[in-house]
């Protein structure tokens, strides 16, 4: 049996592993959540949260021996279970740790590519703590202690990727620290729901929607794209020569390498200047937002996910669901395209970015939705205030959803 004292020790160790943030690129850390606006006379009933994972190692490596050595102290304790019945764990008597072997990884050191770092886990501990202050202490949406009953009102989904699963574990650990777990009832289990990548809709998925791949490819034939290629050719040649690489990995991969390096106060690769980093980011972001600027690409990419979010709200309002705290743990390709649907994406989503869709009601059971993104509340199109009447939000959302989605995804004659 794992005692509460052991859980508390694990929690404190993970806090110690955190790395303090100095002056770094915006990409390194999203702003913290803030209190909601215009809440007088209203009660918070439900919230859905979409997050990007925390700080991670790069996804791209130059494979040069001069690359920085990455040290990943964040472990992963786990136990297999033959019993999937919801409830509490009362018979856990040992844990297993997954360990990356030194110098057998993509980078020098003991880190896999794209692995959540100790800093990344700390960022989601911090996010969970901030959300606890809002949704437990301030708005009393959730109880102060995690019991089996409380766990039944929480629903969690993650992409089936270690860094997103570990990020949401950090989020939930700080939302209900081990000291707030109801004693004598075992360890409450919170399912982290995942799905096969083929069906994943938390990010734009051309496998799920083949037409999306066609439309994205078509963006590379436009005059604007041709001008972009011309304007960035010299930068591309300079960066490749500086890094000593012969195959161009793409702007976003280079941006990721440079920003991940700076987020850990590592030196940039020899010859790479801050001006070069800035230009690489500008090229990566232009390409990212340009393709999402085509309405049908934006809508096809996130339509079914938005539909799930809307359905969750309807189920709660209609009384067919009692789940009131829903977390989606995803990527930049989750947060960016989702906020883009509402015209709110203005930069690349930083690590630990977060979107909150809060459902409020007045004493007459009139419902309102407040849309919050990285610490700011927004007035959505079709709404007159940050507190948007729920029917107005539904109208806006349904104008974004793609009708006959399956047909649209197989329509090779569709235009932007």
UniProtKB/Swiss-Prot annotation:
- Keyword tags: Glycoprotein, Secreted, Signal
Q: Which GO terms describe its cellular component?
A: extracellular region
Q: Name one Pfam family in it.
A: His_Phos_2
Name the Gene Ontology molecular function terms of this record.
phosphatase activity
Entry keyword annotation includes Signal: yes
Question: What is the annotated signal peptide range for this record?
Answer: 1-22
Phenotype of the disrupted gene, per the record: Cells die quickly.
| Entry-listed glycosylation sites | 110, 218, 231, 318, 411
Might you name a Gene Ontology BP term for this protein? negative regulation of aggregate size involved in sorocarp development
Cell compartments where the protein resides: Secreted
User: Mind telling me which CDD domains this protein's record contains?
Assistant: HP_HAP_like (cd07061)
The protein's predominant localisation is: secreted
The answer, when asked if Plastid is one of the entry's keywords, is no
Q: What does this chain do?
A: Cell-counting factor that limits the maximum size of the multicellular structure. Does not possess acid phosphatase activity. Cells with decreased levels of this protein form large groups while cells overexpressing this protein form small groups.
The subunit field of the Swiss-Prot or TrEMBL record says: Component of the counting factor (CF) complex, which includes cf60, cf50, cf45-1 and ctnA.
Specify the protein name: Counting factor 60
- Taxonomic placement: Eukaryota, Amoebozoa, Evosea, Eumycetozoa, Dictyostelia
Gene encoding this polypeptide? cf60
């Amino acid at each position: 049996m794992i005692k509460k004292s052991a859980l508390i020790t694990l929690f404190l160790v993970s806090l110690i592993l955190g790395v303090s943030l100095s002056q770094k690129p915006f990409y390194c850390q999203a702003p913290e959540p803030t209190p909601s606006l215009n809440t007088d006379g209203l009660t918070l009933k439900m919230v859905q949260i979409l997050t990007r994972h925390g700080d991670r190692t790069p996804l791209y490596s130059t494979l040069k021996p001069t690359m920085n050595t990455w040290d990943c102290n964040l472990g992963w304790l786990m136990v297999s279970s033959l019993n999937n019945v919801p409830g509490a764990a009362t018979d856990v008597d040992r844990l297993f740790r997954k360990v990356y072997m030194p110098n057998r990884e993509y980078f020098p050191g003991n880190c896999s590519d794209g692995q959540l770092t100790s800093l990344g886990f700390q960022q989601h501990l911090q996010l969970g703590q901030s959300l606890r202050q809002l949704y437990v202490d301030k708005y009393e949406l959730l109880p102060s202690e995690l019991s089996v009953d409380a766990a039944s009102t929480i629903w969690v989904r993650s992409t089936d990727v270690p860094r997103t699963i570990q990020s949401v574990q950090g989020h939930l650990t700080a939302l209900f620290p081990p000291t707030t777990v109801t004693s004598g009832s075992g360890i409450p289990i919170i399912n982290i729901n995942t799905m096969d990548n083929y069906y994943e809709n938390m990010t734009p998925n051309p496998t799920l929607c083949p037409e999306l791949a066609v439309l994205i490819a078509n963006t590379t034939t436009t005059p604007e794209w041709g001008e972009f290629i011309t304007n960035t050719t010299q930068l591309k040649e300079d960066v490749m020569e500086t890094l000593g690489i012969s195959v161009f990995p793409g702007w976003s991969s280079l941006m990721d390498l440079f920003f991940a390096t700076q987020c850990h106060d590592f030196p940039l690769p020899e010859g790479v200047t801050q001006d070069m980093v800035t230009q690489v980011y500008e090229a990566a972001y232009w390409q990212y937002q340009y393709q999402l600027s085509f309405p049908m690409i934006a809508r096809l990419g996130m339509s079914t996910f938005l539909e799930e979010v809307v359905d969750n709200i309807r189920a709660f309002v209609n009384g067919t669901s009692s789940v009131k705290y829903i977390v989606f743990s995803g990527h930049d390709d989750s947060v960016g395209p989702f906020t883009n649907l509402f015209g709110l994406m203005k930069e690349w989503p930083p690590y630990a970015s977060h979107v909150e869709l809060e459902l409020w009601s007045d004493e007459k059971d009139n419902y309102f939705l407040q849309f919050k993104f990285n610490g700011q509340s927004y007035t959505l199109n079709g709404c007159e205030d940050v507190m948007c009447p729920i029917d107005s939000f539904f109208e806006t959302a349904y104008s974004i959803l793609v009708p006959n989605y399956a047909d649209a995804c197989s329509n090779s004659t569709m235009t932007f």
